[in-house]
From Swiss-Prot:
This is Protein Vpw. It comes from Bovine immunodeficiency virus (strain R29).
Length: 54
């Protein structure tokens, strides 16, 4: 049961990531999300209106 439960959790995690970015391999998602956040942060330095959350 433990293995199956872990498998289900892993599958759920993968499925959530695929909703974020269905066209990327799972192993690239973390890196691409980091890059995207970094791009947003650097853009907001030059253009404050880019980041509407702050």
């Amino acid at each position: 049961m433990g293995v199956r439960e872990a498998d289900r959790i892993q599958h759920d995690r993968v499925r959530k990531k695929r909703e974020i970015s269905p066209y990327l391999p799972v192993r690239d998602l973390e890196k691409s999300l980091d890059d995207r956040n970094r791009i947003y942060r650097s853009k907001s330095v030059y253009d404050p209106s880019w980041n509407t959350h702050h």
